[in-house]
């Protein structure tokens, strides 16, 4: 906390002061609500709706509506909202992000603003990160809403359109972010209005909002179809990449060096920049590629596919690691989420990187997909009239939430004081020394019965630590992407006396570890982090597994100079501190200089990732502006608007365009390309072949000629229209054809735009 904040208070302090009087009003109504019968409490819902119709606002109703939900939750679930949960509910109603720690009951908090905003009858979406949570929360919290007379729906991945439509038409709908986004895209591909499933996007409450709007922000949702591209080039590039030698440069290559053409001594065939995750060919490497593919000039535009696929093949080998970035299961490459450690079925790296990894791992290389419709979560959630979110870790990304989504973060105090002790980091010179220290710490805690949760970043690290603990005779459980089926069982036991659990980031979110009998007296759950993540949020999530609802607990991170974060961001400075202190081998140091260095490195990476996400949004904004226009036009057609005048104008414009292509007022009529004009027009407008009249040959007036052809084209259209006894039948054909043409042209445009949009970033994409 800065000196300014100490003197004047934080942003959260100031905002909470404004909210406390509203909370007081809600609590003052407690005895009044308790005195109501069930029927009288239920009658409040139609009363509130009537008051809204008469001009009252949601803010006017808030204290009483929240008090009603509070009492209903007590009667139905035997759970009564604490004061801090009322604060969280008010912030959600205001379209903000309350940061509430693990175990503070965020799920119950959402019932307050969901009920209040559902009174408008326009739909409330409660967004979760997976089907399990959507179903659980709908069945659990939905009881409160149904008791009060509201309808509750849930949408699961397996649901058909009729079930989806019914769920979206409910007052409150529980749904995952992926299903929401894909339903939006599918709705903008339907041919008949009856096929639509969603209503307008009114109000969304996003659970784990930082996961959805920050971590997933770089992941475009894509509805795809198969492209006709061969996969042979990926295999050829992989063959060559295996034979190329990684080199080193004599100095770090900056953007300025590249622009100025600074000569840099280099060896090998390619260079790797681990910080920016980029690969570049050396002059020698370029020669190797030219010789292998028998091409004269690697940089020639005709060789763009070879250029691109060669870089992807090298990236697959130099920067993408099995059991860290992906796993191979059942002859398929599956992405591992860097933030959660979970396998992400159905997602593929974009830009050909996934195919390059498939070639590297010698599994079937799948064809690249063709984009039929796409949107990012950033642009999708910004379509809501109002949105809010909940999480235990949002403050570190406050600037991004405010700048991109227009939501501020307010830290909500805990219901009970936090008793967890967060120790300073311990730093070791080598990875081996660090792991030995971690194992010793686990053994000491285990000997006294204190449960331990060890958090690792990669699957490899979790398995290495598991082997070391096995050698020491320590019984333990491992939770990573390979053993995710046992997650619920493993997490349920992690707080029991003597339990030792090794987990990747999977255990960092959405899990509530309860302490077993007698564990509180032993110091509670002990959290050990085996290295710092690039994001401080992920570290905070791991810490947050301990110390829930006033429980005791402790956390500590163990680092080494071999860790990626330390190695890539100036470990020479840290080594200098280490050497100056003359630390014997195997001993740790705890030094504020190094702790500050680690935090600065994390902030630097977070800032860089924010810049990437912001850059993506700026790129996607071009697509988004165009998508808005296309989808709005599409909806006009779908809604049944009479398109006769629009199509009539299309015909007139087409005639004019083709005549301008083939005829000119500057040329004699005998030089007009009438044959070519017929070839262009007749396949589109089935009219008689065009011939110049004697008058047109003499006068050479192009405008009059245009007018005549336009009139003839109009007659063809009117004759076709007259063939239908019911004009509406013809209108329906027009609508269907027009929609199909719009879709075909839009998909072709997306094909053209894809290289512009995403080639500067290699992203996991969610494919359907």
Model-flagged regions — what are they?
Residues 1-561, 565-582, 632:
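Conserved P-loop NTPase motor core
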Residues 326-334, 340-347, 549-550, 557, ...:
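Extended, charged helical/alpha-beta scaffold domains that provide interaction surfaces
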Residues 95, 181, 637, 753, ...:
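Generic hydrophobic alpha-helical segments
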């Amino acid at each position: 906390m800065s000196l300014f904040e100490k003197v004047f208070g934080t942003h959260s302090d100031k905002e909470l002061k404004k909210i406390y009087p509203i909370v007081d009003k809600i609590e003052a109504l407690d005895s009044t609500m308790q005195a109501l019968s069930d029927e009288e409490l239920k009658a409040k819902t139609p009363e509130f709706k009537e008051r809204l119709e008469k001009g009252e606002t949601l803010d006017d109703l808030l204290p009483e509506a929240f008090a009603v939900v509070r009492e209903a939750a007590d009667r139905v679930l035997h759970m009564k909202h604490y004061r801090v949960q009322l604060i969280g509910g008010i912030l959600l109603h205001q379209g903000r992000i309350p940061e509430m720690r693990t175990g503070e009951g965020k799920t119950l908090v959402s019932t307050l603003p969901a009920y209040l905003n559902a009174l408008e009858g326009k739909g409330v979406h409660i967004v979760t990160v997976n089907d399990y949570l959507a179903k659980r929360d709908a069945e659990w919290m939905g009881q409160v809403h149904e008791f009060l007379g509201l309808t509750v729906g849930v949408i699961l991945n397996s649901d058909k359109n009729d079930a989806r439509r019914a769920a979206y038409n409910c007052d409150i709908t529980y749904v995952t972010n992926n299903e929401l986004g894909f339903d939006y895209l599918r709705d903008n591909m339907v041919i008949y209005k009856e096929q639509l499933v969603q209503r307008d996007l009114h109000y969304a409450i996003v659970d784990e909002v930082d996961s959805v709007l920050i971590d997933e922000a770089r992941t475009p949702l894509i509805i795809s179809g198969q492209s006709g591209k061969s996969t042979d080039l990926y295999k050829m590039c992989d063959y060559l990449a295996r034979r190329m030698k990684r080199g080193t440069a004599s100095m770090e290559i900056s953007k300025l060096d590249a622009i100025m053409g600074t000569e840099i001594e280099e060896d090998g065939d390619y260079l790797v920049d681990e910080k920016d995750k980029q690969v570049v060919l050396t002059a020698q490497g370029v020669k190797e590629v030219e010789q292998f593919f028998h091409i004269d000039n690697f940089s020639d535009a005709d060789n763009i596919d070879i250029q691109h696929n060669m870089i992807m093949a090298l990236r697959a080998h130099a920067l993408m690691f099995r059991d860290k970035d992906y796993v191979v299961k059942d002859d398929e490459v599956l992405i591992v989420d860097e933030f959660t450690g979970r396998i992400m079925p159905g997602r593929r790296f974009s830009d050909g990187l996934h195919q390059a990894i498939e070639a590297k791992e010698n599994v079937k290389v799948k064809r690249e997909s063709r984009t039929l419709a796409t949107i990012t979560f950033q642009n999708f959630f910004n379509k809501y009239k109002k949105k809010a979110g909940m999480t235990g870790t949002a403050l570190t990304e406050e600037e991004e939430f405010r700048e991109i989504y227009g939501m501020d973060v307010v830290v909500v105090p805990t219901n009970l004081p936090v008793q967890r002790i967060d120790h300073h980091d311990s730093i070791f010179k080598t990875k081996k020394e660090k792991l030995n220290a971690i194992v010793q710490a686990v053994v000491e805690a285990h000997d006294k019965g204190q449960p331990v949760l060890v958090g690792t970043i990669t699957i490899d690290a979790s398995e290495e630590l598991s082997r070391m603990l096995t050698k020491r005779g320590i019984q333990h459980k491992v939770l990573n992407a390979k053993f995710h089926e046992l997650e619920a069982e493993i997490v349920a036991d992690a707080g029991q006396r003597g339990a030792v659990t090794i987990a990747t980031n999977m255990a960092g979110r959405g899990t509530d570890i309860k302490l077993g009998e007698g564990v509180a007296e032993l110091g509670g759950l002990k959290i050990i982090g085996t290295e710092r993540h690039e994001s401080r949020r992920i570290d905070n999530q791991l810490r947050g597994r301990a110390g829930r609802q006033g429980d005791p607990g402790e956390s500590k991170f163990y680092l080494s100079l071999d860790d990626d974060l330390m190695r890539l961001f100036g470990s020479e400075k840290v080594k200098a501190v280490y050497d100056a202190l003359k630390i014997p081998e195997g001993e740790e140091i705890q030094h504020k200089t190094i702790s500050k260095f680690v935090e600065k490195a994390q902030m630097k990476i977070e800032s860089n990732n924010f810049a990437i996400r912001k850059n993506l949004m700026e790129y996607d904004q071009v697509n988004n502006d165009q998508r808005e226009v296309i989808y709005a036009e599409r909806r006009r057609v779908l809604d049944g608007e009479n398109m006769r005048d629009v199509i009539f104008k299309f015909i007139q414009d087409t005639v004019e365009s083709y005549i301008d292509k083939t005829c000119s007022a500057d040329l004699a009529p005998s030089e007009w390309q009438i044959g070519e004009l017929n070839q262009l027009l007749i396949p589109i407008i089935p009219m008689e072949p065009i011939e110049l009249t004697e008058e047109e040959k003499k006068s050479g007036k192009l405008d009059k000629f245009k007018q005549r052809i336009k009139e003839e084209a109009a007659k063809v259209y009117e004759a076709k229209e007259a063939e239908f006894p019911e004009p509406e039948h013809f209108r329906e054909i027009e609508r269907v054809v027009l929609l199909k043409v719009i879709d075909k042209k839009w998909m072709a445009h997306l094909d053209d735009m894809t290289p512009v949009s995403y080639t500067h970033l290699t992203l996991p994409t969610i494919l359907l």
